[in-house]
Amino acid sequence: MAGNRTNDVTVHCSFCGKNQDEVKKIIAGNGVFICNECVELSQEIIREELAEEVLADLSEVPKPKELLAILDSYVIGQDRAKRALAVAVYNHYKRISFTESQDDQDVDLQKSNILMIGPTGSGKTFLAQTLAKSLNVPFAIADATALTEAGYVGEDVENILLKLIQAADYNVERAERGIIYVDEIDKIAKKGENVSITRDVSGEGVQQALLKIIEGTVASVPPQGGRKHPQQEMIQIDTKNILFIVGGAFDGIEDIVKQRLGEKIIGFGQNNKKIDDQSSYMQEIISEDIQKFGLIPEFIGRLPVLAALEQLTVDDLVKILTEPKNALVKQYQTLLSYDGVELEFDQEALQAIAQKAIERKTGARGLRSIIEETMLDLMFEIPSQEDVTCVRITKKAVEGTDKPILETAS
């Protein structure tokens, strides 16, 4: 074979001693030779060592109180949801650590995937991202509305796994301990409780396809994404230890809860349980309500941990703007500091930003765009105005009826 002989001299692998006739390939280096078998062996050793490093990391998972403290430093409000997530994530990685360190297990511990229900902008995606970052595990986000069942135009569910593998730099062992967040899961609910005679391409069929990878299976993933074809090489990944967090707004589910609790939406009825505000209905959601909304029982059964998030108030949004480690106000203050300019927000300005986000029904995710709108002209002009030392954002500036106040050195 080409490259195995040097001027008809017998070449031996410097590591195992085999000659070129005993192996498929020998690669020449600077005074050394290595055969294909030793290359494969070294790759296997590296893979095993990396897998052991992953397992060692899992044995040091922060306890629920420690995870909650991490979430508290980045996420405002949603205390009940954060507690539920902290416990579920700790139990998940504790299960992996102990199961894989002990060969003989009397009890088969099932994993506890998570369903998050809450309005747009309430922090579902950010909570999942923060957990993955704090644990230093691969993380991927998928949009359920882009998925279709096999045989239809759209994205196969296996492509979700490819995103996780890519996040792990194609280290499959590390990806197998990662976290996947599937957003907009409510958008693939069945259209009503009665099964249609037509194919529900983006509904029950997608739930069934997701169910397989969520509950745990060895999946074949196309390394370049897209649809599978017979000649394509596949990446094999075991999903039994991947934590799946799915989330959605589930608009209208509070009405299902009201009906179950005996409170009529129209007319009169006897209240079996008095609930004071809409956000409290979210804390009363049970699997029966989710099934009535349109998720199939088998799918719900693989998501035993329910974390309900509440609508954020003006006060919550103001705290989000100012208090977390990576608060938006701190980010923009840092940006302007690079130009030697201080940035201040009046309290009324912060409240006006929060109020706009609520009116637009964008929640926390809409805060940045509102600040960008308010500060666009300012950030365009400031770099060219060397005499400006401080900028103050007022309520009128947020409302668009006046400009921010500039202070100069003179």
Curated annotation (Swiss-Prot):
Residues covered by the ClpX-type ZB domain: 1-54
Binding site for ATP: 119-126
Matching SUPFAM superfamilies: Glucocorticoid receptor-like (DNA-binding domain) (SSF57716), P-loop containing nucleoside triphosphate hydrolases (SSF52540)
Keyword terms: ATP-binding, Chaperone, Metal-binding, Nucleotide-binding, Zinc
GO terms for biological process, alphabetical: cell division; proteolysis involved in protein catabolic process
Annotated SMART domains: AAA (SM00382), ClpB_D2-small (SM01086), zf-C4_ClpX (SM00994)
A GO cellular-component term linked to this record: HslUV protease complex
GO-annotated molecular function: ATP binding; ATP hydrolysis activity; ATP-dependent protein folding chaperone; protein dimerization activity; unfolded protein binding; zinc ion binding
Listed Pfam families: AAA_2, ClpB_D2-small, zf-C4_ClpX
Residues annotated as binding Zn(2+): 13, 16, 35, 38
Segments crossing the lipid bilayer: none
Keyword Nucleotide-binding: yes
CDD domains on file: RecA-like_ClpX
PROSITE patterns reported in the protein's UniProt record: CLPX_ZB
The organism's place on the tree of life at top rank: Bacteria
Subunit: Component of the ClpX-ClpP complex. Forms a hexameric ring that, in the presence of ATP, binds to fourteen ClpP subunits assembled into a disk-like structure with a central cavity, resembling the structure of eukaryotic proteasomes.
Function: ATP-dependent specificity component of the Clp protease. It directs the protease to specific substrates. Can perform chaperone functions in the absence of ClpP.
Similarity field: Belongs to the ClpX chaperone family.
NCBIfam families: clpX (TIGR00382), PRK05342.1 (NF003745)
Protein known as: ATP-dependent Clp protease ATP-binding subunit ClpX
Naturally occurring in which organism (per UniProt): Streptococcus mutans serotype c (strain ATCC 700610 / UA159)
